[in-house]
């Protein structure tokens, strides 16, 4: 009897849960021909102030709209395991618990538009792994926290329009960065896109939303704005201006530079990897492995100036587990950029110490043993820019790279660049299975503690490794170049012109021509040029771009090994005959011009001086030849008509006229008789 009562109670409860519809809601069941179906529940009673607790468990779509529900309690829908659509639009919801959507693992669409939310529990998205649409339109949300970015990855539609947002986290759009690199699964289907609604918010246009501003200016992107015609509210100079017309002056996405893309190193050696970045604001640099894990090696990072930052990672005593990709990621408010370098580890390591090493004093460096095939000379020490330091750097483009090396051959007649002193080798490591050796040498530093290593790629100089910094010097001292066993002899000049020269040599190795490196420089200069790999041939190389009539020094050495005296040659380029004839023609033209112009100038000067000296007598002579009107003087006393009109002598009239016009003539006449006035009476 008791068992039957309990059974009836359980059945009645299950029946109420499965089939009972809340009194303030309406429930509809839509069946299909295959016997399956879906249940729709609609609750829009204006008097409803809380979420009912007895929805049918097979509900697939629940709509609670236009009610006065103000709060979503914890686990409000936990038993609706088949729920796919939850619409809570145009209510009065002001708060949501973190666990309000617990157990809604099949939910595809969540709409909370038209409520009074000031915040959303973003962590609750973990309880809804299949959620694709989240509508928070027309609420009072004022900010999106930085931690929300990690939960947005699975969303395909996010509507935050008509809220109170002024800015967004810098990494907001990075939530969907995987879509930019993931190719489409099939050519018949378009790539997956994200719909993002951000319009009708009082945006403050600065670097924090620079990515959104740039997004509004492009059309083909994985993330599509629901309304690209968004406007700025602040600052005042951007107020009312469309995102598409805003130009932010101090926002620059980082650019990352690495001096090599592939590094091959011996097992147990040390490698330095360097990364340089520029951007505004000044970017932050992080190193990660290909699997996303952080790097557990010493990392040095420094910002020498605003907008510039570099970072160095030291891989000491590397093993095969250290091989792989190393990513340098630069990040600031304007965006993220990264560069990748691949490290390859080869060989096995055995350390060989000379028999008399124990007899030396602790402070005395060990003696270096000559290597076979190298003529017993001391291997040069070379200062390289990291990464590399164990092999010749590999560049993405085949363009020639300019770098400065410090060599240490024995004294010879070579130019001063080949006479620098270097540190001796302290350890020799043999690589099993290969006839190669690794010489661990510290880079040579100039007085003052600064290294002269530098590289120029594609015409752009990379800065030195800031060797003045103690930490960086400590890392540089651990670097080691790798020397391959290639014997080169009989280096000679096969052909030379005014602008190029062809070098030939004999090699006892069966390796390809790419196993050697050709360096050259103008005689007496310190900057060495690396010959382009495209100019290499079988045991020969062509150096182009030389100056006619100049002296150069060229060296051929195995890749990763510095130049030696016996592998270098001095040559001079031919003089261009055409240039001499041009100079001769120019000299003839100049001489002819001087012969013609100089006498003409002298003649003109003579004429000018002559005119200046003869100007006064010339004018006096002209005045004397002029004809003047003769004047008669009337006497004030009574005279006869004959006497009154009696003409005076011509010379006296002329003298009277000149006396009234010229002071000089007046003085002369006064001395000789004066200007007498004659009266006839």
From Swiss-Prot:
PROSITE patterns (alphabetical): IG_LIKE, LRR
Topology with respect to the bilayer: Single-pass type I membrane protein
LRR repeat residue numbers: 56-79, 80-103, 104-128, 129-151, 152-175
Entry-linked InterPro entries: FN3_dom, FN3_sf, Ig-like_dom, Ig-like_dom_sf, Ig-like_fold, Ig_sub, Ig_sub2, Leu-rich_rpt
CDD domains, per the entry: FN3
Bias (Polar residues): 378-391
Protein name: Leucine-rich repeat, immunoglobulin-like domain and transmembrane domain-containing protein 3
Species this chain originates from: Mus musculus
